[in-house]
């Protein structure tokens, strides 16, 4: 009779430092073998971060965000929008997953044929991260700065608990915005994100 190993994700460490660090190929294989719904990322220093599955509020809000960006991308017929299940191999050696993202046609053309089949070796032009209750705010802010440092032109950190958005841009301080909508610029000029629909996801 087979032995069933039961692992409580809550008891797992949040970071895993391996020596030597896992290679890109090993990390991708690790992600494919993950059966617990844990989202894995690798920092530029080779540390593997484990992010637990989200609750219903955050999952619902993610769906609303991804849907709006996807609809905008289809209407404008340019670039590609991505959901939270993708991981990008970034120039500094890290492999990170945003909650939602957009890659312009120009950057997509830098990928080799089949470059989207695995983890794309490109930094998104635009990323969104959604604060969850388990996220230390400074940790998420640091991740936003990592996106910008790797080439993102615009990054939104959405905090549904404070009902506000921190906007990150290259070479500028983060800008705090509150309200029921936020307008895109640069690579996502014309995008208007309905924040009110996101706030509603956090109401039972």
Functional labels for PLM-detected ranges:
Residues 1-204:
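Gly/Pro/Ser/Thr-rich low-complexity, intrinsically disordered segments predominantly at protein N-termini
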